[in-house]
């Protein structure tokens, strides 16, 4: 299975367990700290700190452009280039800390997601759906993938 023929690819062990666990714990700690600061008026709401108001999954913490996630995106760039054969330019990162009962509904990503990466850093397994042909294809239910998504573009899935 190659990216060039299937328009998606699952890449096993793209991120080490230790790195994934470190980033997961960082993001969960950030979520809790930001929640505390907002609740106790220690810091005003700021997109750089994250939000619970994303319309795709309200009341679930997410952050656009988190510095650690941006760093991970740059670190994964050589892997993405190697597997796609494309000269890619990183555009943005977006992270979400799913909680029990959350479901990311079928949606279309913005044009800058033409080539994108879906990565689960920990938690329960969820299937990922990719609709590059007009049908629902369950790609993998491996323990390190959990973001169900059906974007308009193509994906490389890092595990």
Residue spans of the language-model regions?
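Catalytic core of non-heme Fe(II) oxygenases with the double-stranded beta-helix
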Residues: 100-159
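A short, polar/charged loop/turn motif at coil->beta-strand junctions and beta-hairpin connectors
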Residues: 4-5, 89, 155
């Amino acid at each position: 299975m190659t990216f060039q023929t299937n328009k998606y690819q699952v890449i096993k062990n793209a991120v080490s367990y230790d790195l994934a666990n470190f980033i997961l714990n960082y993001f969960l700690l950030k979520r809790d700290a930001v929640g505390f600061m907002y609740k106790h008026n220690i810091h005003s709401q700021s997109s750089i700190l994250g939000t619970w108001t994303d319309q795709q999954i309200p009341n679930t913490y997410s952050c656009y452009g988190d510095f650690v996630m941006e760093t991970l995106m740059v670190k994964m760039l050589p892997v993405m280039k190697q597997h796609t054969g494309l000269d890619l330019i990183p555009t943005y990162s977006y992270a979400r800390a799913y909680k029990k009962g959350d479901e990311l509904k079928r949606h279309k990503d913005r044009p800058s997601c033409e080539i994108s990466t879906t990565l689960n850093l920990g938690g329960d397994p969820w299937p990922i759906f990719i609709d590059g042909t007009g049908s629902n294809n369950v790609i993998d239910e491996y323990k390190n993938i959990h973001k169900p998504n059906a974007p308009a573009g193509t994906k490389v899935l890092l595990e």
